[in-house]
């Protein structure tokens, strides 16, 4: 299994005197649940018994030309909840760093956008270029950074 491969890789790294294992994880994938985050955390805790772990977390952003190009954005609220689950479960076991969920939403809107979103970028930048400026400009086009059903998991 993948977990067995990761454990073997960590053992090999330890034998080679590599000091730290860096892992990358994406949250917000279609169908992802809190249970999935708990399982990921359990695996990272197991790996941390072999080596110190640095865990980088990014939020899924669908891209044109990929199999998941039409997948919706999970929602800032859902991604935050999943990252919080990981941070809590890995406290003292792994160094956890997450990229900005808010800017991942902006990236998501732009990745699937059209000329209208391009004009919204112009408007947001003219107003200052903060996340709030982007959110307001994109919300005028019907984009929302939060999930339709934040409790669904």
Q: What are the language-model segments listed below?
A:
Residues 1-49, 65-81:
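Conserved non-cysteine loop/helix-boundary elements of the Radical SAM core domain that shape
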Residues 19-25, 53-58, 96-98:
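Hydrophobic faces of well-ordered beta-strands that scaffold small-molecule active sites
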Residues 35, 51-53, 59-61:
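Contiguous mid-protein beta-loop-alpha structural module that forms a pocket-lining wall or clamp
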Residues 47-51, 84-95:
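Structural alpha-beta junctions
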Residues 73-87, 117-126:
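Acidic, Ser/Thr-rich peripheral helices and adjacent loops at domain boundaries
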Residues 91-153:
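Radical SAM enzyme core and accessory elements
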């Amino acid at each position: 299994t993948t977990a067995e491969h990761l454990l073997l890789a960590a053992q090999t790294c330890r034998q080679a005197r590599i000091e730290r294992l860096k892992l990358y994880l994406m949250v917000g994938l279609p169908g992802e649940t809190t249970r999935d985050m708990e399982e990921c955390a359990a695996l990272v805790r197991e790996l941390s018994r072999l080596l110190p772990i640095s865990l980088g977390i990014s939020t899924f952003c669908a891209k044109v030309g990929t199999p998941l190009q039409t997948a919706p954005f999970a929602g800032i609220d859902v991604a935050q909840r999943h990252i919080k689950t990981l941070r809590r479960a890995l406290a003292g076991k792994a160094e956890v760093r997450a990229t900005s969920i808010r800017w991942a939403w902006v990236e998501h809107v732009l990745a699937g956008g059209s000329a209208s979103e391009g004009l919204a970028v112009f408007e947001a930048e003219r107003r200052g270029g903060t996340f709030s400026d982007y959110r307001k400009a994109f919300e005028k086009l019907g984009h929302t950074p939060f999930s339709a059903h934040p409790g669904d998991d």
